[in-house]
Amino acid sequence: MNSIIKEHYFEHKSTIELARDILGMRLVHQTQHVKLSGYIVETEAYLGATDIAAHSYRNLKTKRTDIMYQPAGAIYMYQMHRQVLLNFITMKEGVPEAVLIRAIEPDEASIPYMEIKRNGKTGSELTNGPGKLTQALGLTIKDYGKTLFNSNIWLEEAKIPHIIEATNRIGVPNKGIATHYPLRFTVKGSRYISGQRKGQILTEIWQ
């Protein structure tokens, strides 16, 4: 059985380290009827007060971002256009940094249920984007404020990537130097990475 991630996992790690280290972990959502899960293959780090691309830049605090000031493991859901995005708070209370989950590889047993939630989408289209994966997992804005440690959403140790790549974050234009921060982390070769080209897909991506 995979080990469930507890509070101590986040201690003494930076947000960048966590964004890399959770690649390959199994993200689980226990719904009322079924357990849905997938393996994280793409993340982005957001570095709080000094990161102009972060919602908490300059320690901005609003009703929406209030959760970012909670301890590591808090779940920050927010809506962008018609999509809901999933983030985990990464640092101690009062330090508003987070990791955005951008893509997952569906657990095989979850695929039939995810296809229903994604209105018939199949293959990589199921979960190859931050709004797609939340829909596939059945996550909604109502999950805002939960934590990874005492709710129906959690992480488990699962797989180890062969290679992790770091590139610029997606959708961060006109943010000065922050536009070019290499804070997007991916499991090299995963077919589920957002915007992945067929020629970049590898058959062996896990150790």
Swiss-Prot record:
Principal EC category: hydrolase
RNA-binding recorded as keyword: no
EC number(s) on file: 3.2.2.-
InterPro entries according to UniProt: Formyl_transferase-like_C_sf (IPR011034), MPG (IPR003180), MPG_sf (IPR036995)
Keywords, sorted A to Z: DNA damage, DNA repair, Hydrolase
Superkingdom, natural source: Bacteria
UniProt record, GO biological process: base-excision repair
Cystine pairings recorded for this chain: none
Keyword DNA damage found: yes
Molecular functions per Gene Ontology: alkylbase DNA N-glycosylase activity; DNA binding
Family affiliation: Belongs to the DNA glycosylase MPG family.
PANTHER family: DNA-3-METHYLADENINE GLYCOSYLASE (PTHR10429:SF0)
Listed name of the protein: Putative 3-methyladenine DNA glycosylase
